Amino acid sequence: MNLSTLQPAKGAIKSGRRIGRGQGSGSGTTAGRGNKGHKARSGYTSKNFEGGQMPLHRRLPKFGFSVPNPVKIRTVNVADLEKYVEKGLLEKEITLESFKSIGIIGKKDRLKVLGTGEVSSALTVTAHYFSESAKEKIEKAGGKTVVVFRTIEEAQKMKKELFEEALLTPKVSVDEKKKAAKKLKA
């Protein structure tokens, strides 16, 4: 027996049906698809196709709208901060850039620190929001919480100020800007 002489056993391979090759073959003309219509055609039907009837997604009314650039608030627990510091992913002074570097937030995201778990080491944490319990636990362990007003992307766009100062600069409302402009004119 050689590799060149190997053959499948008799009856192991069955030739496929040749469809649409004349009426004498038994599966010619309509090729086993019945008579004409949508199901006789190639391709597929979408699951929401209702045979030409007005589909459900068009019968129901529309309301509301989707916010084009929604603000995403990512969360991280106090216990997780402790783990990240122990593993060496974060240092004792935790900034938004360090959160971004390990993939917790993106450039446009906001960050909220939640109070699940315990903290034993003194950490300086910078974030947009802190829950009451998180703030309490961090400060109880001898740490510090720094509230930031801007995202990383917004701070990078502010060319006049240093990056850290830009993050900490409170946003001025449109009304306040108008009032300031009026004062300058007067």
Curated annotation (Swiss-Prot):
Biased segments, Gly residues type: 21-31
Pfam family of the protein (one): Ribosomal_L27A
Keywords: Ribonucleoprotein, Ribosomal protein, RNA-binding, rRNA-binding
InterPro entries: Ribosomal_uL15, Ribosomal_uL15/eL18, Ribosomal_uL15/eL18_sf, Ribosomal_uL15_bac-type, Ribosomal_uL15_CS
Ranges where the record places region Disordered: 1-51
GO molecular function, one term: rRNA binding
A GO CC annotation given for this chain: cytosolic large ribosomal subunit
One Gene Ontology term from the biological process aspect of the record: translation
SS bonds (residue pairs): none
Subunit description: Part of the 50S ribosomal subunit.
Cited HAMAP family: Ribosomal_uL15 (MF_01341)
Family according to the record: Belongs to the universal ribosomal protein uL15 family.
Function recorded in the entry: Binds to the 23S rRNA.
Identification of the protein by name: Large ribosomal subunit protein uL15
Origin species: Chloroherpeton thalassium (strain ATCC 35110 / GB-78)
Gene: rplO
